[in-house]
């Protein structure tokens, strides 16, 4: 069932890539792992030409634009091409396909008290939680991720040609089983907790930056 659902998303992505220069450029850039990162320039006019919500994704191997092609309750499927898929749940990256050179994030399960569902704008300073992740390479399943949240200052964030007032929330994560420690950053709408931009460590080798290019279009048309 999981394979079928992802397959439907990939077909939609191929149609997008075939008719939109920006999406085609995204495919090329995200495949640039051999030669290193290549930043993709995105304009507001290019984004406006695509009716689907879009994000800009930057990885250690490149950057590109992904389109939202499917929603299942709070789970969103963002796709760039036939080999790159990012699944977000309330702004948290929970699975990747074709993004990790040394292996992908294969799954994520959140604790009942995880603050992403109700919004990080409400998280208390020093709040702790857990989640469990599966890694594609190494067959590591159910690794515990301990996290501690810190509220930071309100900032002004510019996305394309617009400015947004956001609250920065940091998440210190610790995955003892693989010796991973890192700090994730989330820039959220202080009114409803929507994550406009984030930097997330997904595996030991895969750190991503996610920017919502269409904050006013959060769901499929």
Predicted segment positions?
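C-terminal motif of bacterial Sec signal peptides marking the signal peptidase cleavage site
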Residues: 15-18
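Bacterial N-terminal signal peptides that target proteins for export
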Residues: 1-9
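Acidic, serine/threonine-rich low-complexity disordered tracts
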Residues: 20-107, 122-221
């Amino acid at each position: 069932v999981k394979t079928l659902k992802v397959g439907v998303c990939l077909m939609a992505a191929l149609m997008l890539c075939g008719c939109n220069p920006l999406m085609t450029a995204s495919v090329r850039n995200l495949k640039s792992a051999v030669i290193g990162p290549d930043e993709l320039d995105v304009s507001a006019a290019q984004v406006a030409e695509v009716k689907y919500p879009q994000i800009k994704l930057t990885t250690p191997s490149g950057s590109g634009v992904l389109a939202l092609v499917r929603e299942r309750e709070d789970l969103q499927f963002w796709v760039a091409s036939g080999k790159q898929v990012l699944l977000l749940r309330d702004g948290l990256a929970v699975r990747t396909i074709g993004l990790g050179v040394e292996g992908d994030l294969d799954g994520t399960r959140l604790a009942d008290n995880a603050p992403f569902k109700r919004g990080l704008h409400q998280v208390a300073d020093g709040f702790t939680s857990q989640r469990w992740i599966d890694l594609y390479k190494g067959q590591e399943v159910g690794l515990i991720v301990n996290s501690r949240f810190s509220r930071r200052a309100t900032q002004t964030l510019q996305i394309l040609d617009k400015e947004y007032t956001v609250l920065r929330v940091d998440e210190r994560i610790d995955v003892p089983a693989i010796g991973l420690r890192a700090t994730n950053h989330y820039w959220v709408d202080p009114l409803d907790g929507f994550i406009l931009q984030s930097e997330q460590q997904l595996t030991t080798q895969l750190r991503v930056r996610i920017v919502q290019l269409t904050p006013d279009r959060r769901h499929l048309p």
